[in-house]
Amino acid sequence: MTTFLGNPVTFTGKQLQVGDTAHDFSLTATDLSKKTLADFAGKKKVLSIIPSIDTGVCSTQTRRFNQELSDLDNTVVITVSVDLPFAQGKWCAAEGIENAVMLSDYFDHSFGRDYAVLINEWHLLARAVLVLDENNTVTYAEYVDNINTEPDYDAAIAAVKSL
């Protein structure tokens, strides 16, 4: 059972599992452009999904994945939340993280529904990490049961490095 702030929460949809093909998406970048999964074609992808960049755990998760994986060839870390693109951009500027890919699902929550991470009770995204290979096949999936805790960074990073 997944919990948020100590309370059980529900989701719509089916969580992706290892071996599944990732769903396409259309999300808003910090410059208000639309980004799709196809924009990252041919790259290994880490989808770092968070409730809000304005929380300590989400900030730590975003910073850590960007620091530890930014030097890997042909790899992109994509952080997804329902924060407004302006808030995501402001966070990147304040943290001095210039090349982070921050995408927002604020507009219609379609990513949250398609990836089964939209918390029905709060309309925030749950914490999850998905690693996709160059063909968008899920090679690692972690949906964090207690959304207030950090993901297993070591396992996710090892999954990316093994590709």
Curated annotation (Swiss-Prot):
Its EC number is 1.11.1.24. Residues 16-162 form the Thioredoxin domain. InterPro entries: Redoxin, Thioredoxin-like_sf, Thioredoxin_domain, TPX, Tpx_CS, Tpx_Peroxidase_subfamily. It holds the Pfam family Redoxin. The keyword Disulfide bond applies. The active site is at 58 (cysteine sulfenic acid (-soh) intermediate). It comes from the Bacteria. It is an enzyme of class 1 (oxidoreductase). GO terms for molecular function: thioredoxin peroxidase activity. PROSITE patterns: THIOREDOXIN_2, TPX. It catalyses: a hydroperoxide + [thioredoxin]-dithiol = an alcohol + [thioredoxin]-disulfide + H2O. Disulfide bonds join 58-92. The keyword Methyltransferase does not apply. Keywords: Antioxidant, Disulfide bond, Oxidoreductase, Peroxidase, Redox-active center. Coiled coil: none annotated. HAMAP family: Tpx. The active site is a conserved redox-active cysteine residue, the peroxidatic cysteine (C(P)), which makes the nucleophilic attack on the peroxide substrate. The peroxide oxidizes the C(P)-SH to cysteine sulfenic acid (C(P)-SOH), which then reacts with another cysteine residue, the resolving cysteine (C(R)), to form a disulfide bridge. The disulfide is subsequently reduced by an appropriate electron donor to complete the catalytic cycle. In this atypical 2-Cys peroxiredoxin, C(R) is present in the same subunit to form an intramolecular disulfide. Homodimer. Belongs to the peroxiredoxin family. Tpx subfamily. Thiol-specific peroxidase that catalyzes the reduction of hydrogen peroxide and organic hydroperoxides to water and alcohols, respectively. Plays a role in cell protection against oxidative stress by detoxifying peroxides. This is Thiol peroxidase. It comes from Streptococcus sanguinis.
